Regions:
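Secretory/organelle targeting and membrane-embedding segments
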Residues: 1-118, 123-412
Length: 412
């Protein structure tokens, strides 16, 4: 395994909320390699205990070092890498706007063989910028790794395992038995301090174009024979995906969230530019032009400030049976069979867990030098192609902006 993690942006929100807790969980579970080191780096200075305070109590002090860096200066980054042995995993916990400068600086360092440069979504803002990011990674001298943390969720990994290990499920996993597949990413919270990013992205770019298309790929793909074939099968789905229509978009108006808090109209939220016409709700229908799924409809729906938190994959079978696979709240697998009386028999299986958060699984994949939980370069590009017709229609103003009250079920 890679013995050193260089964490750029170590003082930021991503590191504090997700990466350090994930590293702590891996250390407590004895899943990190012997002699493992975390080199934190950011622009500001920290005192001797500064990184330890950020990292929390689950990581020992002798595992942590800190270097102030200038991302545009290769010699500054070289000082952070100096003294490490073997390959390094460089995690860019940074705003996407500085990815290019940082990768170019890293390319000048001549990192050890088998080193990796890790970037978070969004992978560009359209097809061309995604391709440009891929080109930078390809010429960096290190292996590029694209993180979509949803792939690290146990529930998502279980989806593929269920198909592989339960032949009865795989037998009805096609358009001959399934009428419709719904992929839902419904959140009860509003902006929660993310207006600076979200107002420039919107629901479609924030989650539907990445998290939800990855789920679509895992649902629609032919089962890979091994991990090496996984990205090929996912890419085949994205190549076969076609939007049906130009979708729906909406934004919330003043209302009461599920937790009781009152929120104003989205356009009046702090940090929001009302002239951007940013959607907080996105709905897109797709079809897969593949042998197994021709004729079935896929509906993807994402929204903020809704009545219920639901992140699910739902298969609606032609015989009235419904299979609900929880992704992140609820996380159970639920099978519903409609009865003649109008009632339904419901069978519920709780999700097994190894106790590790999604980012812990992602970090293990990074450090092991594998790519099972990554987004492939062509996948990142093709995902933008899938949603391009919808984005073009929305930017042209041909799709109306609907409204829904915060805390409601969404637009009618």
């Amino acid at each position: 395994m890679i013995p050193t993690l260089l964490l750029l942006g170590a003082t930021g929100d991503l590191a504090r909320r997700y990466l350090f807790p994930a590293l702590g969980a891996l250390h407590l579970a004895d899943r990190l390699p012997d002699g493992f080191r975390v080199v934190g780096a950011a622009r500001g200075e920290l005192d001797g205990n500064g990184l330890r305070r950020l990292a929390g109590d689950d990581l020992p002090a002798d595992m942590l070092t800190y270097h102030p860096v200038d991302l545009a200066d290769p010699s500054s980054l070289a000082a952070a890498v100096d003294g490490t042995h073997g390959p390094v995993a460089v995690y860019l916990a940074l705003p996407p706007g500085v990815f290019a400068t940082t990768i170019q600086s890293l390319a000048a360092l001549d990192l050890a063989p088998e080193s990796r440069i890790v970037v978070e979504k969004p992978f560009g803002d359209d097809f061309e910028s995604a391709r440009a990011l891929n080109a930078l990674l390809a010429h960096s001298g290190a292996d590029g790794y694209r993180v979509d943390h949803v792939l690290g969720l146990e529930t998502v990994q279980r989806l593929v395992a269920m198909r592989r290990n339960m032949p009865v499920v795989e037998r009805f996993w096609n358009a001959g038995k399934v009428d419709r597949v719904e992929i839902l990413w419904e959140e009860t919270l509003g902006l929660e301090g993310r207006a600076g990013y979200f107002d420039r992205a919107g629901a479609l770019k924030d989650v539907l174009q990445n998290h939800m298309l990855q789920l679509l790929a895992l649902v629609g793909m032919e089962l890979p024979r091994d991990s090496a074939e996984l990205h090929e099968r996912k890419l085949a789905v994205l190549r076969a995906a076609r939007v049906a229509g130009t979708g729906r978009r909406a934004r919330y108006t003043a209302g009461r969230l599920a937790d009781g808090r009152e929120v104003p109209d989205y356009a009046d939220e702090d940090g929001v530019d009302p002239l951007r016409c940013t959607e907080t709700y996105a709905e897109v229908a797709l079809e897969l032009q593949t042998t197994g799924w021709t004729g079935a409809r896929f509906l993807m729906r994402a929204g903020k400030a809704l009545a219920r938190k639901r992140k699910l994959v739902v298969l609606l079978l032609q015989n009235g049976v419904e299979l609900e696979i929880g992704i992140d709240g609820p996380e159970d697998i639920v099978l519903r069979v409609a009865a003649a009386t109008g009632d339904a028999l419901e069978l519920r299986a709780p999700a097994p867990s190894d106790g590790l958060p999604a980012y812990a699984h992602v970090l293990l994949d990074v450090l092991a030098g594998t790519n099972e939980l990554s987004v492939g370069a062509e996948e990142a590009e093709r995902a933008w192609c899938v949603v391009a017709p919808v984005l073009a229609a929305w930017e042209a103003g041909t799709v109306p902006m609907e409204e829904y009250a915060a805390g409601s079920a969404g637009p009618s």
